[in-house]
């Protein structure tokens, strides 16, 4: 974060939530309309871009050249990436998923979960799902890493900022449970517990992505790649929603291990 700039987390998150919620609740309504269901994604996509758009506006209007240069550098400078972390970037989520499947078997989970899913767990009428997963990772991390997280870290310790960010990131997805054919809509219709598990799983995920981003000198492109790989890995195997509950527990253990490993960094006092 830039010490010469005064971040405004309240303005950022309030603006992002208001814009996203208005667009996504509108899109949710249109997704069930026989007349407009084919174009509801035109409303949803700007909502997905809101974290990035608000971040860009605040940075552009800041009149702080150091802040602007820092954003551009973290977005395009590949030298920020620590090559030693690349194996973790690519292998962490597959390892978590495979371990979760193994742990599910004594509780009745099927070994067929090790098979490739052969498709995606949700559908859209407008944008290919794989492209949507990439868009989600890109626009979210451009906003979250471009301004949002730094704004929280300017006020709080890394640990508290990570917890707050995870809560905000989780709640940001809330309107999606009302969007026809969305992943969140599908799992909530299967079971409210599956839906709640989705929101809960975001909390440790926020800590993990934040830690990985910091270990790569806040590289935004690295955060985008890591986020996309997480999204993609969640769709590759035929993992059940029951196993995803176990997966959330594993993610919490991973997040806890990361915090203990870098305890000094997470609890370092400001100033």
Swiss-Prot record:
Family label: Belongs to the peptidase U48 family.
Positions in coiled-coil regions: none
Entry GO CC: membrane; plasma membrane
UniProt cross-references to PANTHER family, sorted A to Z: PROTEASE (PTHR35797:SF1), PROTEASE-RELATED (PTHR35797)
Main location: membrane
EC number assigned by the record: 3.4.26.1
Catalytic reactions of this protein: Hydrolyzes the peptide bond -P2-(S-farnesyl or geranylgeranyl)C-P1'-P2'-P3'-COOH where P1' and P2' are amino acids with aliphatic sidechains and P3' is any C-terminal residue
A GO MF label: peptidase activity
Cytoplasmic compartment segments: 31-38, 106-125, 180-192, 238-243
Membrane topology of this protein: Multi-pass membrane protein
GO terms under biological process: CAAX-box protein processing; proteolysis
Gene field: rce1
Compartment(s) of residence: Cell membrane
Name of the molecule in the record: CAAX prenyl protease 2
Extracellular side, ranges: 1-9, 60-82, 150-159, 214-219, 264-271
Keywords noted in UniProt: Cell membrane, Hydrolase, Membrane, Protease, Transmembrane, Transmembrane helix
Annotated consequence of substituting residue 173 to A: Strongly decreased enzymatic activity
Taxonomic superkingdom: Archaea
Site entry: Transition state stabilizer: 227, 231
Record's function text: Protease involved in the processing of a variety of prenylated proteins containing the C-terminal CAAX motif, where C is a cysteine modified with an isoprenoid lipid, A is an aliphatic amino acid and X is any C-terminal amino acid. Proteolytically removes the C-terminal three residues of farnesylated proteins, leaving the prenylated cysteine as the new C-terminus. Hydrolysis depends on a farnesylated cysteine residue and no activity is shown towards geranylgeranylated peptides.
Activity regulation comment: Activity is unaffected by metalloprotease inhibitors 5 mM EDTA and 5 mM Zn(2+). Activity partially inhibited by 1,10-phenanthroline and 1,7-phenanthroline.
Membrane-spanning segments: 10-30, 39-59, 83-105, 126-149, 160-179, 193-213, 220-237, 244-263
Natural source organism: Methanococcus maripaludis (strain DSM 14266 / JCM 13030 / NBRC 101832 / S2 / LL)
Record: active site: 140, 173
NCBIfam families in the cross-refs: CPBP_MmRce1 (NF041656)
Keyword Membrane belongs to the record: yes
Effect of residue 227 to A: Decreased enzymatic activity to about 20 percent relative to wild-type
């Amino acid at each position: 974060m830039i010490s010469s700039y005064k971040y405004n987390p309240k303005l950022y998150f309030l603006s992002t939530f208001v814009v996203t919620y208005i667009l996504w609740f509108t899109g949710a309504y249109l997704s069930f309309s026989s007349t407009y269901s084919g174009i509801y994604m035109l409303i949803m996509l700007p909502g997905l871009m809101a974290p990035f758009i608000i971040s860009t506006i605040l940075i552009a209007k800041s009149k702080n050249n150091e802040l602007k240069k820092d954003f551009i550098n973290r977005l395009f400078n590949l030298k920020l990436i620590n090559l030693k972390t690349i194996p973790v970037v690519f292998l962490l989520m597959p390892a978590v998923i495979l371990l979760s499947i193994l742990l599910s078997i004594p509780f009745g989970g099927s070994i067929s979960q090790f098979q490739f899913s052969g498709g995606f767990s949700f559908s859209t009428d407008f944008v290919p799902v794989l492209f949507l997963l990439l868009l989600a990772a890109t626009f979210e991390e451009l906003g979250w890493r471009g301004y949002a997280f730094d704004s929280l870290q300017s006020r709080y310790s890394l640990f508290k900022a990570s917890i707050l960010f995870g809560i905000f990131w989780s709640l940001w997805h809330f309107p999606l449970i009302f969007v026809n054919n969305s992943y969140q809509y599908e799992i909530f219709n299967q079971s409210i517990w599956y839906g709640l598990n989705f929101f809960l799983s975001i909390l440790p995920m926020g800590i993990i992505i934040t830690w990985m981003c910091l270990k790569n000198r806040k590289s935004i492109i690295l955060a985008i790649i890591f986020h996309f790989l997480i999204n993609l890995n969640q769709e590759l195997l035929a993992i059940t929603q029951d196993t995803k509950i176990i997966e959330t527990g594993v993610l919490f253990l991973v997040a806890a291990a990361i915090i203990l490993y870098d305890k000094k960094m997470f609890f370092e006092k400001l100033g």
